[in-house]
């Protein structure tokens, strides 16, 4: 419990790039909007240490596209944490066209150090796992529309090996974000 408190005390959410001075790694997790992500990239990158990594938590926007806003595309990578983060073990590592092997290796090590399972994928819209989870969630919503009880849908998802059911995932991600991604 003490170790947990110590670690949590070192994590700081911020809306000021000044708080990022000297960071080795920044993981951007703003809304799925290329313009907003570009703004955050350009404000945060100058604060990183030399060779610092800037990662986007995007779930759908191609990393190569997002890296276009970066002054150091070789240090730009995708680290997509799945919701709910405390239950989902996978972290999708998305390599852009200019992402260096060193950035990939350091990112892979980071994901393992925090106790998650890294999955390296190539760059494409939706990557791999968002496509899989999209199907899982969409089918759960369709089943709900067909009149199947929500508890039965959730239970089936968990029995199939998922940490949570499709309706819980859609609630966690939000219908607004899912519609934005689809459109």
Kindly label every feature range from the protein language model.
Residues 94, 98, 106-108, 118-183:
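Substrate-binding/catalytic subdomain of NAD(P)-dependent oxidoreductase enzymes
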Residues 1-24, 34-35, 39:
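Conserved N-terminal Rossmann-fold NAD(P) cofactor-binding segment
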Residues 11, 26-28, 55, 83, ...:
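Conserved structural-core and active-site-/substrate-pathway-adjacent residues in large, well-folded domains
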Residues 15, 56, 122:
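Short loop/edge segments at beta-strand edges and connector loops
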Residues 5-10, 75-78, 153-158:
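Beta-strand segments within the central parallel beta-sheet cores of soluble alpha/beta enzyme folds
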């Amino acid at each position: 419990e003490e170790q947990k408190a110590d670690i949590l005390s070192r994590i700081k959410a911020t809306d000021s790039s000044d708080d990022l001075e000297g960071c080795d790694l920044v993981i951007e997790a703003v809304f799925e909007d290329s313009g907003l992500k570009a703004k955050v990239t350009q404000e945060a990158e100058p604060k990183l240490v030399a060779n610092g990594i800037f990662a986007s938590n995007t779930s759908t926007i191609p990393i190569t596209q997002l890296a276009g806003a970066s002054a150091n595309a070789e240090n730009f990578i995708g680290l997509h944490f799945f919701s709910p983060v405390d239950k989902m073990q996978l972290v999708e590592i998305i390599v852009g066209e200019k992402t260096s092997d060193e950035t990939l290796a350091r990112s892979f090590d980071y994901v393992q150090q925090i106790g998650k399972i890294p999955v390296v994928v190539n760059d494409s819209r939706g990557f791999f796992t968002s496509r899989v989870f999209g199907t899982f969630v969409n089918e759960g919503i369709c089943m709900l529309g067909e009149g199947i009880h929500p508890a039965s849908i959730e239970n089936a998802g968990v029995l199939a090996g998922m940490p949570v059911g499709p309706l819980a995932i859609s609630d966690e991600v939000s219908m607004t974000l899912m519609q934005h991604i689809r459109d």
